């Protein structure tokens, strides 16, 4: 709690929100949001960034900062109550003036980010326009040098070993940090570099085994697919008996991080079970679906993403949608995937916010979602030194959507479509995007919009770079 010098708790204190709804609607929402706002690298930026550096055969190194937040600067006047362990050593009512940001202080992450940004600017780096967690060397006459930041976890990427040594020395002069050498792990991922093949392998087997042990599934019977093709996951009727909440939400949270980083094969099943995390909305069938995913994870814990490669790395994009496949709401599922070379670096599986009237309409919706991601990916690759030589190609398997975008005419069946969903059509008219047809069998985005059988799931996972890396290990 922040106090005034007189000890009045109401002078500087900002109450902690009790729920997310209160956090974004209360009168204090802007204050605590700004205080806590520290840039963190999105996983899409991380995978794209690592993929390009592997293909260029750059060196990847990382430092380790000690007491990170204490190295920031505090610009506000903040007073603290005397900790209970010191009450006997100081007079009653003693207040302490805080000199440095400490862990638990709302603005500590922001202060550390500002301090680090100032340090990197002094070393000749500037923020990327596409991602505020990516820093680029400002002197274009020198060899490229990139720094990716996630709070206090940094990744250096460059082929200039002399500059790498100088940057490390500059950070050690200004902050308390040690050099960890070549990158081996990052944010819970195990990283294996193959300089000969110019590939980087990302696995999360250690975290998977922790999750399986936590819920007692380390010795469970294996499952070939995470979700059966004829599943019946839907909202339960209101008069049905309620199952106890238990660790349902913990299941979803643990698997969500795995899916975000390396296991895109869990995207669609997780998007289904995550709709029923509210107590009283999930039933036995939803519990069984989560348990099946853990059994599937147990049998595929050795799988990982293989980024990079010596071949020509081209950004490919696929978009797909399944019309009205939600049994309870009749809403549709959309998804996209962006691959660099033979490995996916960005993916999404989501449900439409409202009911869509036709497969053409849901195709337009999915195309707009993919077009938004395409614009950002183009900016990110441009900052990474990869300028597109020709308009990127978006592959879809919806012929009606392709015809509507190419003919550019309005019909009575399509005049109600919201204009904001015609982004893909607008980019095509400007020459910034090409739309191409691909058969459903070759559309890798199917894995993000529907439950697939074992053979199709394995085929699409292989096409997206999710391969068996480690032997299947059962951890006691």
Specify the residue positions occupied by each region the protein language model found.
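RNase H-like nuclease module associated with reverse transcription
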Residues: 276, 313-314, 350-476
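Catalytic palm subdomain of template-directed nucleic-acid polymerases
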Residues: 69-82, 103-107, 137-175, 192-203, ...
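Chromodomain-type histone methyl-lysine reader module
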Residues: 1-118, 122-129, 134, 471-476
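Polymerase palm active-site segment centered on the conserved acidic dipeptide of motif C
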Residues: 123-130, 155-208, 212-215, 220, ...
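Structured nucleic-acid-interacting core domains from mobile-element enzymes and related host factors
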Residues: 40, 50-57, 295-321, 386-388
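Mobile genetic element proteins and their domesticated derivatives, centered on retroelements
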Residues: 20, 36, 43, 64, ...
């Amino acid at each position: 709690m922040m106090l005034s010098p007189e000890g009045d708790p109401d002078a500087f204190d900002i109450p902690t929100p009790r729920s997310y709804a209160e956090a974004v609607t209360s009168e204090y929402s802007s204050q605590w949001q700004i205080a806590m706002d520290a840039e963190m690298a999105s996983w899409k930026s991380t995978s794209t960034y690592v993929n390009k550096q592997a293909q260029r055969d750059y060196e990847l190194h990382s430092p380790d900062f000690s007491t990170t937040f204490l190295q920031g600067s505090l610009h506000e006047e903040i007073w603290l109550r005397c900790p209970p362990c010191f009450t006997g050593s100081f007079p009653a009512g003693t207040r302490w003036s805080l000199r440095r940001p400490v862990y638990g202080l709302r603005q500590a992450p922001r202060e550390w980010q500002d301090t680090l940004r100032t340090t990197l600017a002094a070393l000749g780096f500037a923020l990327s326009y596409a991602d505020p967690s990516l820093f680029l060397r400002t002197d274009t006459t020198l060899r490229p040098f990139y720094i990716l930041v996630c709070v206090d976890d940094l990744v250096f990427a460059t082929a200039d070993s002399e500059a790498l040594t100088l940057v490390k020395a500059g950070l050690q002069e200004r902050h308390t940090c040690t050099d960890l050498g070549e990158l081996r792990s990052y944010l819970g991922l195990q990283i294996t570099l193959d300089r000969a093949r110019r590939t980087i392998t990302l696995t999360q087997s250690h975290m998977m085994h922790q999750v399986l042990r936590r819920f007692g599934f380390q010795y469970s019977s294996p499952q070939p697919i995470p979700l059966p093709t004829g599943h019946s996951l839907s909202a339960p009727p209101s008069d049905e008996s309620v199952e106890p909440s238990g660790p349902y939400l913990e299941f979803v949270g643990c698997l969500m991080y795995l899916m975000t980083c390396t296991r895109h094969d869990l995207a669609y099943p997780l998007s289904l079970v995550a709709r029923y995390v509210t107590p009283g909305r999930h039933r036995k069938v939803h519990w069984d679906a989560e348990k099946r995913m853990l059994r599937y994870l147990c049998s595929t814990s050795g799988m990982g993403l293989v980024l990079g490669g010596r071949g020509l790395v081209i950004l490919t994009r696929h978009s797909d949608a399944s019309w009205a496949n939600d049994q309870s709401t009749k809403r549709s599922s959309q998804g996209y995937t962006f691959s660099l070379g033979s490995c996916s670096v960005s993916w999404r599986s989501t449900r439409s916010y409202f009911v869509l009237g036709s497969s053409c309409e849901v195709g337009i919706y999915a195309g707009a979602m993919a077009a938004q991601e395409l614009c950002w990916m183009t900016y990110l690759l441009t900052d990474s030194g990869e300028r597109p030589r020709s308009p990127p190609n978006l592959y879809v398997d919806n012929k009606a959507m392709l015809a509507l975008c190419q003919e550019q005419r309005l019909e009575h069946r399509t005049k109600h479509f919201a204009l904001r969903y015609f982004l893909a059509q607008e980019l095509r008219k400007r020459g910034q995007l090409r739309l191409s047809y691909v058969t459903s069998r070759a559309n890798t985005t199917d894995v993000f919009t529907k439950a697939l059988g074992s053979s199709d799931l394995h085929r699409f996972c292989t096409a997206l770079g999710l391969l068996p890396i480690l032997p299947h290990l059962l951890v006691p």
